[in-house]
Amino acid sequence: MTKLPSLTGKDILSILKKLGFEIKRQKGSHVFLQNPDVRATVFPIHSGETIGPGLMAKILRDVNMTKEEFYQLLK
């Protein structure tokens, strides 16, 4: 299993935008993204703070991706 590097909310946002996700709404620091397949996820964007492993696992489940698939997008 591949261990992902520490990523910020902005890093994850840019990767998900490449996959076709769009920001549907934002309340405070929490961003709600959705793609045309109606998959959606919510995560915070705090400047300088990284997303923890538990929240990263939730985001990957929400967008129906494995760590390996996500890691390929980082390269």
Each PLM stretch: what is its role?
Residues 18-19, 32, 60:
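Helix-centric, low-specificity signal for extended rod-like, repetitive segments
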Residues 10, 48-75:
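C-terminal structural segments of small proteins and small subunits
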Residues 1, 45, 59:
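Generic anion/oxyanion-binding catalytic loop in active/binding sites
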Residues 23-54:
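A short, structured beta-strand/loop element
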Residues 1-27:
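N-terminal first-folded block
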Residues 18, 37-38, 73:
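N-terminal low-complexity, intrinsically disordered patches enriched in charged
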